[in-house]
């Protein structure tokens, strides 16, 4: 059976581990860098890595020798984190891995750190094809497997979730890491309103941090700000995870990353999954924070698939995105599943009852138990009003949308005309995609965005495509906001379609022909903002 020694050194934690596939046992030895003040300084982190990596590797080798004898005979491969991360730290860990592989005369495996966060949860849960939420210091994204790669279904458009929280705690004067301190203070606080920024399945944290700092400076008790911070950020992560489950039809969620150690976040995600009838797996804390155990486990899967790397090709990649990794170790089904066609459907936000014979659809935005009641009530009412208003506005602009028959914002209830025969996810065609491009161009020309134009929010009829669910839409004259509409649609296509390239080209061509080409040009700039672009 396979036995792999893994080395982790992406940023702050020097770690070495041994994974024995026969027993599924994982030995981990770690030495984390703790700055004297402020956040992580790359030079100091690299100095720590230089001192700590040899000692954790030695501990791993001692473990091998005491259990299986000579490491040269007992170890099948050495795996290391190639990225993403801090370049100086990655290079130290990479050098150690190359040297050790040479000493042991065994193959070298280069692992993507973020995919390892996903795979350790999938490995230990036994899930077939889950959606994964990674919530760590420098990252926040939702992934799903499709056609040989993990696709980014949603991600932060600015800073990582942990780094965002740390920026607030440094402003307050607390030492690193800030997350546990926010969690502790939030227990004694009352909710305060902060910006809630979800765009399709992407999110942004910079505005929340600025508002939290301002609230603290204005005299709001720090415990209250911490409570508002947790309730807002973690509700965003839970909502986007639910949107990904709804988009793909998946019923499994795995969670990774150090921020996921937060008990309130785990509670929110568990409540969300229970309400959907989905299974959730949160690894034990030693596998959530940065660790070499996940590197060794994924390294073993890659080694068994023949996915090894030569020394000349083993350079580190500080900007190594998870969707760049060819997934050589699995060939099972994609995360995208068939969409139910029964008369009652559960989306990310609402339950929809369909009366096809009567030509009506009743949509109810249900209370979300995972969200703070004040936040939940505000979002449900706002989104119901926006959906009714913008659905009708789009129709006035010549965009095919359902007629709104009734609306009750306080109850989160709308009654619509039943339109289309299927949603775009199951009836994908170039002509329908072109319709979406033209429809969004018309909305933008009238000064508003859809907000969540995924394939699930497009209904396809015999001769046209209809836009539905404008709940995240709003009035705006910003090219940035128009381009985000395009980004959301293309990201959802990329995560669920077998070959999205032709559809994306048709979509952009149609948008350019009917709208402002500057929006498509701005889309290219937005695409550089995702983590490690």
UniProtKB/Swiss-Prot annotation:
Component of the KEOPS complex that consists of Kae1, Bud32, Cgi121 and Pcc1; the whole complex dimerizes. NCBIfam families: arch_bud32, arch_KAE1, gcp_kae1, PRK09605.1. Coiled coil: none annotated. It is an enzyme of class 2 (transferase). It catalyses: L-seryl-[protein] + ATP = O-phospho-L-seryl-[protein] + ADP + H(+); L-threonyl-[protein] + ATP = O-phospho-L-threonyl-[protein] + ADP + H(+); L-threonylcarbamoyladenylate + adenosine(37) in tRNA = N(6)-L-threonylcarbamoyladenosine(37) in tRNA + AMP + H(+). SUPFAM superfamilies: Actin-like ATPase domain (SSF53067), Protein kinase-like (PK-like) (SSF56112). GO terms for cellular component: cytoplasm; EKC/KEOPS complex. Its main location: cytoplasm. Keywords: Acyltransferase, ATP-binding, Cytoplasm, Iron, Kinase, Metal-binding, Multifunctional enzyme, Nucleotide-binding, Serine/threonine-protein kinase, Transferase, tRNA processing. Residues 338-533 form the Protein kinase domain. In the N-terminal section; belongs to the KAE1 / TsaD family. In the C-terminal section; belongs to the protein kinase superfamily. Tyr protein kinase family. BUD32 subfamily. The active site is at residue 452. This is Probable bifunctional tRNA threonylcarbamoyladenosine biosynthesis protein. Fe cation binds at residues 113, 117, 290. It is found in: Cytoplasm. Required for the formation of a threonylcarbamoyl group on adenosine at position 37 (t(6)A37) in tRNAs that read codons beginning with adenine. Is a component of the KEOPS complex that is probably involved in the transfer of the threonylcarbamoyl moiety of threonylcarbamoyl-AMP (TC-AMP) to the N6 group of A37. The Kae1 domain likely plays a direct catalytic role in this reaction. The Bud32 domain probably displays kinase activity that regulates Kae1 function. Its EC number is 2.3.1.234, 2.7.11.1. HAMAP family: Kae1, Kae1_Bud32_arch. It comes from Natronomonas pharaonis (strain ATCC 35678 / DSM 2160 / CIP 103997 / JCM 8858 / NBRC 14720 / NCIMB 2260 / Gabara) (Halobacterium pharaonis). GO terms for biological process: tRNA threonylcarbamoyladenosine modification. Its cofactor is Fe(2+). Binds 1 Fe(2+) ion per subunit. Residues 1-329 are annotated as: Kae1.
